């Protein structure tokens, strides 16, 4: 009897004579609030976001690291373009040679378009060559260093090209019409032979070095690099765990010397003569001859041609290019110091193991052990 009663009770519980099944309860819970009302509530919630909250979110985004980094990169690209277009390229084919891949790109552009009336084409093609030369280095950077670093670097190079082609064709402010210091291309070289006109070359180099140094410092702060040899040096610096700043500087100096030597070798008689006596030297041949120079309708010749080539190579163009690199490096150190002094205190009961580990990874700085006092 007891078993039968328990079965009846169980059956009663399972039958649920109330007429409300579990499925109907679930459906009623879901359908209790219609979908239209739920959608209206979501819409009202979204509408409650005030304009003040939107502004606060926008300000928070402006302060975010991503926005700051790309702001650095954009401004750096503009300064880099201004440094080259308005100060380096403005010194014409026989002026300042930038360092790194930029020196190679400028050397090729100058070799193909050497005349002063081809300055705009020469400058534009410099940026094209500079971008193309960095493509294989960009691929190297993606493989060996990382996509984030390499992508930001190629963005920097692309923005420089964009700024150049945007400003090159704007009236009044393009580099052919706007001169921040003097119109170097129009200087009367003949009346200043061996004189003060060369001082302007060093002024242009110093200003270009400052602008380019600021650009490099900002692009480093933005988590990118200036491309070119920076990709290779960044890889070996991380791999070998050593500072390669000195090697980088030496390579840049070598590139300047090599490109200037090639340019000097390729100079024709008329081109070399125009460097020292101006582009209208042919109208002043008699005056130049009275000064004792060997010159004819083709330009300087014989020993004067050779001596002036040597003089050109070891002249203002070389030292102005070095000045550009030095000023650029000093400015970079001010904006983005390579070395920051910090003291680290490690409190440990395993001092021997810590010291051995630091020595194993060739930690370059001093390690001072202070015994604990009771």
UniProtKB/Swiss-Prot annotation:
Keywords: Cell membrane, Membrane, Transmembrane, Transmembrane helix. It is found in: Cell membrane. Residues 25-46 have a biased composition (Basic and acidic residues). Residues 1-46 are annotated as: Disordered. GO terms for cellular component: plasma membrane. The keyword Cell membrane applies. The chain crosses the membrane at residues 70-90, 127-147, 153-173, 199-219, 242-262, 312-332. It is a multi-pass membrane protein. Signal peptide: none annotated. To M.genitalium MG432 and MG443. This is Uncharacterized protein in fibril gene 3'region. The lineage of its organism: Bacteria, Bacillati, Mycoplasmatota, Mollicutes, Entomoplasmatales.
């Amino acid at each position: 009897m007891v078993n039968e009663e328990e079965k009846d009770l169980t059956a009663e519980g399972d039958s649920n004579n109330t007429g409300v099944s579990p499925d109907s309860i679930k459906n009623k819970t879901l359908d209790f609030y219609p979908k239209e009302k739920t959608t209206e509530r979501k819409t009202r919630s979204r509408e409650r976001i005030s304009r003040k909250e939107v502004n606060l979110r926008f300000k928070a985004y402006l302060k975010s690291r991503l926005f700051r980094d790309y702001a650095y990169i954009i401004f750096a690209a503009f300064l880099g373009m201004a440094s080259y277009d308005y100060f380096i390229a403005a010194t014409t084919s026989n002026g300042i040679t930038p360092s790194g891949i930029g020196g190679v790109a400028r050397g090729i552009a100058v070799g193909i378009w050497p005349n002063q009336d081809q300055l705009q084409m020469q400058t534009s093609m410099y940026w094209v060559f500079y971008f193309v030369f960095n493509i294989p280095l960009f691929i190297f950077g993606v493989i060996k260093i990382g996509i984030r670093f390499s992508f930001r670097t190629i963005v920097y190079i692309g923005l420089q090209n964009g700024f150049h082609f945007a400003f090159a064709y704007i009236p009044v402010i393009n580099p052919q019409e706007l001169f921040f210091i003097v119109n170097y291309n129009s200087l009367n070289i003949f009346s200043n032979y061996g004189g003060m006109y060369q001082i302007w070359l060093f002024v242009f180099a110093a200003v270009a070095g400052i602008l380019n140094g600021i650009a490099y410092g900002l692009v480093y702060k933005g988590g990118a690099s200036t491309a070119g040899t920076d990709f290779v040096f960044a890889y070996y610096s991380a791999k070998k765990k050593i500072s390669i700043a000195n090697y980088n500087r030496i390579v840049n100096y070598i590139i300047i010397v090599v490109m200037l030597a090639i340019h000097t070798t390729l100079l024709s008689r008329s081109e070399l003569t125009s460097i020292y006596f101006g582009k209208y030297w042919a109208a002043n041949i008699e005056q130049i001859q009275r000064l004792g120079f060997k010159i004819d309708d083709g330009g300087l010749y014989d020993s004067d041609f050779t001596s002036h080539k040597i003089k050109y190579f070891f002249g203002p163009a070389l030292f102005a290019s070095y000045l550009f690199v030095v000023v650029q490096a000093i400015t970079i150190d001010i904006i983005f110091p390579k070395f920051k002094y910090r003291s680290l205190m490690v409190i440990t009961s395993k001092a021997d193991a810590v010291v051995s580990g630091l020595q194993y990874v060739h930690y370059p700085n001093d390690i001072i052990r202070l015994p604990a006092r009771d």
